Amino acid sequence: MTEAEALTSRLNAVERDRKHKNIRPSDAATLLILDRTAGGPVRVLMGKRHMRHRFFPGAFVFPGGKVDPADSRVRLADDYHPQVLAKLMHEMRGPKTVARARAFGVAALRETYEEAGIFIGVPRGDAVPAAGVSFAGFAEAGVQPQLAPFRLVARAITPPNRPRRFDTRFLACWATAIAGRTPDGLGPSGELEDVAWLTFEEAKKTELPAITFTILDEVANRLSRDPALDPATPVPFYRWRGKGFERMLV
């Protein structure tokens, strides 16, 4: 069995609840913040979902969520690397615009603040408040959101006939992009009970959604071959074709 077959077979094994009315996937984004400053293996920021959630209660996840319409109108300190932008726009559903591509990164850093209390951006005491209530915290912290540190590491679309469907871009950045944190180390949304920096092996021993486990494997494999996360490196794109997942490289 090839590496690609092993990764897709795990996802296929859990996709049995497909009896719901088909819905259009919502755009979503998530962020893997990677830390290699402490020595030893790379660690990734993970959060434990609150037990009150109906969707994966108690599971460990990366910060992230749906893209909001206002995410495409946020004032940014800088832009993606051109090759990252090109990958984000590959086979984009609906209007294929740079503003929509930027919204993925903005959603990822917004959700990271809301859930984990971490600001990704450029410290600027005179930062202009960005659009949207969620970015008031950035303005108060004197941080302007930025996209330059982000690398696309995967994309996945939930199969048809699932109760919830997302077209998710998985972005990554190094912990050196962190410009600040909330005092209590948690975000204002209350969606996560706890956050922790885990090695990939530690993370895979927690309760994880299948796609999260798969992305951990994908990123671990990439780091072994591409430790600098070169923006030109092809990234996996998972989507449902016929009776199972297809994994292609973008």
Feature locations, PLM:
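N-terminal leader/linker segments that precede catalytic domains of diphosphate-processing enzymes
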Residues: 1-250
